[in-house]
């Protein structure tokens, strides 16, 4: 780092963490001061990062920028190494913006407000750290740092089954972390030079068996967070029991950490393994899309239906990163950003509805549109974005993934046709379960409208402001996608090109005599789906 350069990223990570440590010293029993303090810290951190990127980030470069590198624990080979590129920068902005809005959404939290605020700020530091660190061991530390806050936020401020949901979350994520750590150590200790530097690890020449095992470990660990079927079962429970602000961060940011890890580590560091796992990722992505959509139909709890919808939509990320195309990669990153805003908006508005009706069961909410017209309008807009209505960000991201897969030369025509057809089935199911959700919650039989909902008790200005801040980028990106894609276009092209460069080496290993049985014999690599066309 240049001696005159401001350590922007270190400041952005340390500031919320240090601010959280100050909270116990603030004299405030009712939490009124804590609200403004937490909002101020989150907003300051967001403004700091926007300023740093605006003044110092060059969109025309793909290498890491705003870099910082200090020896932290030399005995362990651990460096405080930070930097951002086109992949991490927009996700950091997403994380800080959603966390800032979540502090506004949590304005009415009165139970242990100091602890709640402190945990939110610790999570913010961890999220920025995950996206900014360039040391693999430091990445793992940041990854783990957000687990305990999420567990406490669900177990203390959640619903009736909060302990079950929180325990399930921590067990799943802890198990995934074991695989991430195992893969991290395997790569770092291979060869004579022990290093955790991500760029150095990406340059090592690993045996194929080690690369495949490390890839599988990362896939399981990140697959829990994404989540990928069948590692997804913690998500509906966590969402249904978590408070709305926590669900906003969980769906808007934490799920994206899984997608980021798959791109940053699995694709960039292990391209040879990625080309062998890519067909499996396509299959898992399609399963996510269709399974999530089908299970959403059976959910009578509003937040569980939205959780199933998240599982479905995150499947597009898997399909995009396994397409081997620039378009597919572009769509995968855009889907992460788009779903971050859309999911945060939907879970926030479900919380607004819950505060009035005191229920999440859709049949018990039936008929509240006439009492909450503003909430209904905002909820409808977010749902339209989720079902990929043209003019909204969800449409652009999903269409881009479709085009990326259809234009891929890495898969046989038959495989692509089946994959696109099944993905389209999931897309068709989405408006059915979302529109039925709107009908059941806001219309239905008016006589069943909750008695606890006072006439005219609609969304307040603070709540409208939060919803508008989430809906604005959804519409802006939908109308002019380059607002988002400009930040990462060059990076996605670089990553996709790096993976494609490894593909011919793999193609040369395939049987040249057209013996399909011989190809299918390498079942762990699924080569029959790969065509040597690059």
From Swiss-Prot:
Its EC number is 7.1.1.-. Pfam families: Oxidored_q5_N, Proton_antipo_M. InterPro entries: NADH4_N, NADH_Q_OxRdtase_chain4, NADH_Q_OxRdtase_chainM/4, NADH_UbQ_OxRdtase, ND/Mrp_TM. One of its GO terms (molecular function) is NADH dehydrogenase (ubiquinone) activity. GO terms for biological process: ATP synthesis coupled electron transport; electron transport coupled proton transport. It is a multi-pass membrane protein. It comes from the Bacteria. Its main location: membrane. The chain crosses the membrane at residues 6-26, 34-54, 87-107, 113-133, 136-156, 169-189, 209-229, 243-263, 277-297, 311-331, 332-352, 376-396, 418-438, 464-484. Coiled coil: none annotated. Keywords: Membrane, NAD, NADP, Plastoquinone, Quinone, Thylakoid, Translocase, Transmembrane, Transmembrane helix. The keyword NAD applies. The keyword NAD applies. Belongs to the complex I subunit 4 family. This is NAD(P)H-quinone oxidoreductase chain 4 1. The lineage of its organism: Bacteria, Bacillati, Cyanobacteriota, Cyanophyceae, Oscillatoriophycideae.
């Amino acid at each position: 780092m240049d001696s005159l350069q401001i350590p922007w990223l270190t400041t952005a990570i340390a500031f919320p963490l240090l601010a959280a440590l100050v909270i116990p010293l603030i004299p405030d029993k009712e939490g009124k001061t804590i609200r403004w303090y937490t909002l101020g810290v989150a907003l300051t951190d967001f403004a700091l990062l926007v300023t740093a990127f605006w003044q110092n980030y060059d969109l025309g470069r793909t290498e890491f920028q705003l870099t910082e590198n200090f020896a932290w624990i030399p005995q362990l080979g651990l460096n405080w190494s930070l930097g951002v590129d086109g992949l991490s920068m927009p996700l950091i902005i997403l994380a800080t913006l959603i966390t800032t809005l979540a502090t506004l959404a949590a304005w009415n939290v009165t139970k242990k407000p100091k602890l709640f605020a402190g945990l939110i700020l610790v999570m913010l530091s961890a999220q920025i750290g995950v996206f900014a660190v360039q040391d693999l061991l430091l990445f793992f530390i940041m990854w783990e740092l957000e687990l305990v806050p999420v567990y406490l936020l669900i177990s203390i401020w959640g619903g009736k089954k909060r302990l079950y949901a929180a325990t399930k979350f921590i067990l799943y994520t802890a198990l995934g972390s074991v695989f991430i750590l195992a893969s991290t150590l395997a790569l770092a200790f291979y060869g004579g030079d022990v290093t955790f530097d991500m760029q150095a690890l990406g340059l090592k020449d690993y045996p194929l068996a080690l690369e495949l095992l490390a890839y599988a470990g990362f896939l399981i660990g990140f697959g829990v967070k994404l989540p990928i079927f069948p590692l997804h079962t913690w998500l509906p429970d966590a969402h249904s029991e978590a408070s709305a602000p926590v669900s906003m961060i969980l769906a808007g940011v934490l799920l994206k950490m899984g997608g980021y890890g798959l791109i940053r580590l699995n694709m960039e560091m292990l391209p040879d393994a990625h080309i062998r796992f890519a067909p499996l990722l396509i299959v898992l992505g399609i399963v996510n899309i269709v399974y999530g959509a089908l299970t959403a139909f059976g959910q009578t709890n509003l937040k569980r239906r939205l959780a199933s919808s998240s599982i479905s939509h995150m499947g597009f990320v898997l399909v995009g990163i396994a397409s081997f195309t620039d378009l597919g990669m572009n769509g995968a990153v855009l889907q992460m950003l788009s779903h971050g805003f859309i999911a945060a908006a939907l879970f926030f508005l479900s919380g607004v509805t819950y505060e009035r009706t005191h229920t999440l069961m859709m049949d018990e909410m039936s008929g509240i549109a006439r009492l909450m017209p503003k909430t209904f309008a905002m909820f409808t807009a977010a749902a339209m974005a989720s079902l990929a209505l043209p003019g909204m960000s969800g449409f652009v991201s999903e269409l881009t993934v479709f085009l990326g897969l259809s234009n891929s030369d890495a898969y046989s025509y038959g495989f692509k046709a089946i994959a696109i057809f099944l993905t389209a089935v999931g897309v068709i199911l989405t408006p059915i379960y979302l529109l039925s959700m709107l009908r059941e919650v806001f219309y239905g039989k008016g006589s069943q409208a909750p008695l606890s909902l006072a006439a005219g008790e609609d969304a307040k200005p603070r709540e409208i402001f939060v919803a508008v801040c989430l809906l604005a980028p959804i519409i802006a990106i939908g109308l002019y996608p380059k607002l988002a894609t400009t930040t990462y276009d060059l990076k996605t092209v670089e990553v996709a090109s790096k993976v494609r460069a490894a593909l011919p080496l793999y193609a040369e290993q395939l049987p040249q005599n057209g013996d399909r049985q011989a190809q299918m014999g390498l079942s762990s690599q699924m080569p029959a789906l790969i065509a040597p066309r690059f």
